[in-house]
């Protein structure tokens, strides 16, 4: 099976060819939005982090933002920061350059003399980058180049018996063609983790699947919380789901039946192809964000009661 895509120099294949206007901190998000609104062919993302945070959270922010830039749906990147943030715009741009040969430029609002001057410079840079991106044509690519994130949200009683098994069948077909799929939301494995773990390609992967579920419950317990107080959600209950076990047993169907080749931390880049699992929160926005940062170029999203969740960089197919 073949499809038309944008072949990158690192061998990855995108289904879009965006120029990304990327804030390095919350303070620059609005400026990035203004720039993207003025240049056709660009996309921006909104973040509320990037400064005044602990080391682990700062590292997570850097991993997500770098992952967005490295995604095969992105041709090039215009980074904008404030100039005094923890995740510095120059450092972020340098990190992207070290990991990729995509065109990257960066601007600091304080250094350039304010948002208006920064936006003007960024618009000029983005227009030049879009012009270069327009010269790249789609080429015929193999199905083994597909990287599909699989998500569910707003689930109801039909999700586990209809849409999720249907998408699971799709996941198996992509696997058989040599492509890659990724499933996340660890809390929605709980109660069915023993079933999912049987798909582990090795005993180590089996144990990793069990461990991420146990770690999630322990993390909540340290704060005196239980995931069962938030799962199923009110939306799920109205739709007919009564317990976390019922929800999880339906949830894992969307990942298919093929062996799981790797378990990844949140927003990490995979080292293997095949069926992957990413350890993320059970929140659509976080999980889709993390999987796209991990490299997924398409998101297939099942929903029973409906949800508008999408993503700026990857098409989300409901």
Q: Which functions belong to the PLM regions below?
A:
Residues 1-151, 155-298, 302-318:
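Metallocofactor- and cofactor-centric catalytic cores in central/energy metabolism, strongly enriched
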């Amino acid at each position: 099976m073949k499809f038309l895509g944008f072949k990158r120099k690192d061998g990855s294949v995108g289904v879009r060819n965006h120029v990304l206007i990327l804030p390095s901190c919350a303070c620059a998000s609005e400026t990035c939005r203004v720039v993207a609104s003025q240049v056709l062919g660009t996309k921006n993302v909104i973040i509320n982090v990037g400064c005044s945070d602990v080391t682990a959270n700062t590292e997570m922010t850097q991993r997500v933002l770098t992952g967005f830039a490295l995604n095969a749906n992105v041709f090039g990147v215009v980074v904008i920061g404030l100039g005094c943030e923890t995740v510095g715009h120059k450092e972020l741009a340098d990190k992207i350059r070290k990991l990729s040969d995509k065109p990257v430029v960066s601007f600091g609002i304080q250094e350039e003399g304010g948002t208006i001057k920064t936006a003007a410079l960024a618009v000029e840079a983005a227009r030049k980058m879009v012009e270069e991106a327009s010269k790249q044509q789609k080429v015929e690519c193999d199905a083994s180049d597909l990287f599909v994130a699989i998500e569910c949200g707003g689930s109801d009683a039909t999700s586990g018996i209809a849409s999720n098994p249907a998408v699971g069948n799709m996941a198996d077909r992509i696997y058989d063609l040599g492509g890659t799929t990724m499933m996340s939301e660890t809390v929605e494995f709980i109660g069915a983790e023993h079933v999912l773990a049987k798909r582990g390609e090795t005993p180590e992967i089996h144990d990793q699947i069990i461990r991420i579920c146990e770690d999630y419950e322990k993390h909540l317990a340290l704060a005196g919380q239980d995931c069962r107080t938030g799962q199923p959600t009110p939306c799920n209950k109205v739709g007919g789901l009564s317990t976390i076990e019922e929800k999880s047993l339906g949830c894992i169907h969307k990942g298919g039946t093929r062996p799981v080749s790797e378990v990844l931390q949140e927003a990490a880049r995979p080292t293997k192809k095949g069926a992957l699992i990413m350890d993320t929160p059970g929140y659509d926005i976080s999980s889709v964000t993390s999987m796209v940062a991990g490299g997924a170029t398409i998101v297939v999203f099942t929903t029973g009661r409906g949800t508008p969740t999408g993503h700026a960089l990857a098409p989300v197919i409901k």
